[in-house]
Regions:
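Globin-like tetrapyrrole-binding proteins
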Residues: 1-139
C-alpha cells in the first residue's frame, strides 16, 4: 500500500472511532438540499450507515486499483442513477464527507482533505459515467 493510501485508510479509521462521524456526515448532507433530504425521508439510517461504511471502503480500494472494486463502484453508480442521484448531488456528498472528516479526524490537514477529494472523485466520476452510459444504452 502506498503512503497516501495508508494515510487515507488511517484517516478513515480515526473518523470511524467517533460514533458521531456518520451522523455529522448525514446531518450536513441532508441540510444541503431539500431534494436530498426528501430522498432520505424514509431511510433506515442504522442500515444506511452500514452501507456508507462499506461504500467508503470500496471507494478507497478503488482508488488503490484493487481488483474487483470497479464492479462494485459500477453497481453503486447504476443504483444511484435508479434513485435519481445527479452529478450535482455527488458534489454535495463529497463536500459533506470532507466536512465530517475535518470535524472528526484529529489529524486532518488541507493536504489530507485534498487527497480524500481526489480518491473519492475517482469513484464518483466512474459512478457518473456508468449512470450516463445506462441512459445512453436506453436511447
Amino acid at each position: 500500500m502506498t503512503e497516501q493510501a495508508e494515510e487515507l485508510t488511517a484517516s478513515y479509521y480515526r473518523c470511524r472511532r467517533d460514533e458521531r462521524f456518520l451522523d455529522t456526515f448525514y446531518d450536513g448532507f441532508l441540510s444541503k438540499s431539500p431534494t436530498i433530504a426528501q430522498m432520505f425521508a424514509k431511510t433506515d439510517f442504522k442500515f444506511q450507515k452500514l452501507v456508507l461504511r462499506q461504500s467508503l471502503l470500496e471507494m478507497l480500494c478503488f482508488d488503490r486499483g484493487m481488483s474487483g472494486t470497479r464492479e462494485e463502484i459500477e453497481r453503486l453508480g447504476l443504483h444511484h442513477k435508479e434513485l435519481g442521484v445527479t452529478p450535482e448531488m455527488y458534489a454535495l456528498w463529497l463536500d459533506s464527507l470532507c466536512e465530517a472528516i475535518k470535524k472528526h479526524d484529529p489529524c486532518h490537514t488541507p493536504a489530507l482533505e485534498q487527497r480524500w477529494r481526489e480518491a473519492m472523485l475517482k469513484s464518483i466520476e466512474e459512478m457518473i459515467a456508468v449512470g450516463a452510459s445506462q441512459v445512453a444504452d436506453r436511447d
